[in-house]
Amino acid sequence: MAHKRMVREAIVDSGVTAVLRGIDAEDIVSVAEAVHAGGVTAIEVTADATRCTEMIADVDRALADTDAVVGAGTVMDAPAARDVIEAGAEFVLAPNLNENVVEVCNREGVVCIPGVMTPTEADRAMAAGADILKLFPASTVGPGHIGALQGPLGDVPVMPTGGVSTENVAAYFEAGAVAVGAGSALVDYDAIEREDWDAVRDSAAEFVAAVEDARS
């Protein structure tokens, strides 16, 4: 469980998890390396990709000697959780709450971040053993929803994802977020098309700087 604790701390310390979605398997390592070079240490490969387990394993191998932690997102059920963990995922995220996924993660000693929106879902997730709560889609409720959850439930760890940008990330941290998830606001997809890895790095670095400013 010491490794699980370290991974959770890395996610929180990083402040932002890069969501790598819709990226070709041939580009995934280059993108992950560029994002990591930009200062992101928590990297999520979404499990809705056709070759997701291969991609997770490739990224895990490529960043093995760094401070990066590699996880899987969009993990909807227990079989998918088992598959991505076997591929090397150190943390698992989902847009939904499936207690079976939480159970698999706890059994395997892997950080679990299920998706929640309501106090009932948040309470169920924490009771099941979730490590962090993914507020998704955060854009539909905004930063104030974090306080609305923490008011009755106490200081539950919330990670808003969906619509988080450099413009609003400070508001989410001020509201009590422990970290955020970011996709297109952090990952420069146009630069990926051009194979301009320096631009991908710089886009990630800009988001990391916004997170650091928000937390300072």
Predicted features, each with a name:
Residues 95-141:
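Histidine/lysine/aspartate-rich catalytic loop segments that bind and position anionic ligands
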Residues 30-31, 77-87, 120-128, 164-180:
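Catalytic cores of alpha/beta
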